[in-house]
Amino acid sequence: MSIPLLYYPLSTQNQRVESFEILSNEEQSKIYTTDTLPSASEMDELIWAAYRQIFSEHQILKFTRQRFLESQLRFNQIKVREFIRGLAISDSFRKLNYDVNNNYRFVELCVQRILGRDVYNEKEKIAWSIVICNKGVIGFIDCLINSQEYLENFGDNIVPYQRRRIIFQRVNGETPFNLKTPRYGIEFRDKLVKPQFIWQGAIRRFRPQEQRPRAGDPVLFLNMVYDLNITPKFNRYPGLVNR
């Protein structure tokens, strides 16, 4: 028997406040939906927006692309909500997001990308992380996709987006999620392999470049004399020892 979703208090966020202002087109989030019967080019933009939202990439990568789901969406065999679910439960999404983060950070990423808002508090992270432990990653994604919050804001035909990122009362909007929460956490970034230089031989003498003699330096003439390797045949001054 699985544990039900634990209670967590809500916090004040822009997306919880009703909007009465009228923003310019540049400030409003563009809504990609199939309710308007999009053309072929508009469908391409909708698919690109879905990949950008779920994978947080501005380009569709070959590794993340799901051509079968794209074909089903183009021929109206599945809804946008099912397409979003297919992207979120794909192996590429799991490898790029779940395998390189802990459960708490994975919850934060999924809530931002699927529900279009930030997590309310640490208690919400704990509550959803318990769902991951009980139902697995696919069960957790299904809980978000089938939640009342998702259906009320996006329904079956709208691509999720960051809700109320800009409001009329503020000069600057909130930071986009792809900049606020990058793919890799601090724990994983510290484990990344850093490039190392492997020297084949031992370094006997090293002089920094700024300390190397330049043209006209007497040291260069002294080295030239050493390179001549002149050995005198006799010693005019027997009292002196040859070097």
From Swiss-Prot:
Major place of residence: plastid
Bilayer topology annotation: Peripheral membrane protein
A single cellular component GO annotation: phycobilisome
Keyword line: Antenna complex, Chloroplast, Membrane, Photosynthesis, Phycobilisome, Plastid, Thylakoid
Gene3D superfamilies linked: Phycobilisome linker domain
Subcellular location: Plastid, Chloroplast thylakoid membrane
Pfam families associated with the record: PBS_linker_poly
One of the GO biological process terms: photosynthesis
Sequence ranges assigned to domain PBS-linker in this UniProt record: 11-191
Role summary: Rod-core linker protein required for attachment of phycocyanin to allophycocyanin in cores of phycobilisomes. Linker polypeptides determine the state of aggregation and the location of the disk-shaped phycobiliprotein units within the phycobilisome and modulate their spectroscopic properties in order to mediate a directed and optimal energy transfer.
Misc. comment: Although originally identified as Cyanidium caldarium, these sequences derive from Galdieria sulphuraria.
Oligomer status and interactors: The phycobilisome is a hemidiscoidal structure that is composed of two distinct substructures: a core complex and a number of rods radiating from the core.
Family stated for the protein in its record: Belongs to the phycobilisome linker protein family.
Protein name: Phycobilisome rod-core linker polypeptide cpcG
Species this protein is from: Galdieria sulphuraria
Gene this chain is encoded by: cpcG
